Amino acid sequence: MWYEKITFLFKNKELRNKLLFVIFLFVVFRLAANVPIPGIGAENLRKFFDQNQVFGLLNLFTGGALSNFSIVLLGLGPYITSTIILQLLTMIFPGLEKLYKEEGEAGRQKFNQYGRLLTIPLAAFEGYGMLTVFARQGIITGLSLPIMLSAILTITAGAMFLMWIGEIISEQGMGNGISLLIFAGIVARIPINIFQTFSSYSPAQIPSYIAFFALSVVIIAGVVLITEARRNIPVSYAKRVRGSKMYGGVSTYLPMSVNPAGVIPIIFALSILLFPGMIASYFGTYAGWVGSAATSAGLFFNNVWIHGVLYFLLVILFTYFYTAVTFDPKTIAENLQKMGGFVPGVRPGPSTAVFVKHILNRVLFTGAIFLGLIAILPSIVAGITGVTGFTFLVGGTSLLIVVSVVLDTVRQINAQLQMREYENF
């Protein structure tokens, strides 16, 4: 069956061209991630990322573009941050919420345009902060005012370029472009992590490696299971007679995912969690109480236990927040009522909205705890097995992005294949 689908995918000219175009954009992204910003010496950068937990996470998030000091060193961070800010603002400004939820595709396009515009100042600000932190710690050299202005413009343009590539990929119908680019960056780091792990290999660690890979298989299977899990709410449609024909009278269900927010909460939480460490690094070189306070704050947020607890709580918070923004039980209930649908044993309208919200909260609790545990898995796995080099494969952002993106892309490609197969009849 899979062989037939793959064969049809490559036989269909339109789908084949879309797939090849997406692969080409991946290549462009990886090339850009290896083009350094001109005029700045960054020889000590890789060593810094190996030793710094906060920036090491950020480097993984950008697919290694940060350690290469490339023109796209910020990755998709500014765009993701602008999305977080706008979605928070929908809860404060009713007009913005109406634009996002009630004005259809045109409203969402306008909302996305606001996100693009907000990305520009955020990218410039983050670029300036990053350059200043590196310069004050002596990691980069040759940072005069003209070169800094040029570098900030380059970094901002790089962030907008990646955002544009992500949107083009999304338009091809092969998956979410932003998630796919992050996925491509993570996959590109796999050979490097494997090499680093085996370069320090010793026969005494064989039991730890076996335990690690066994645990990895179990964790990945659990991620797939939870990602695909659904809670089906039964829905029936009333019978209606029009002329001599009868409509409705069928039963179906409303699928409710255990993990409706997908990978977004982990990405949001990671973006927020990186800020304290970056700010502490920025002010840590100041003299007096400012530098002392920044250093103390940096040590506080770099503590493994504090970092893990904050990460866990932020993921749970953003799971509920993102689901509240994107999934509205009241709208679901109204749409069901308009189409003549109802949940057996529940009154249509407000009662259905309350019922759906109750089920959603119960399901979401399981999904939020699961996401929180996935976020802190690298520390747990490393503590159990003593193996640290491969933790990127089984924990946090890396694991969930890889699994979620693969499953989502396969789903969208299957939908494209089915649509083309129907057209052939």
Model-identified regions with their sequence ranges:
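N-terminal cationic and glycine-rich segments that engage phosphates or anionic surfaces
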Residues: 1-425
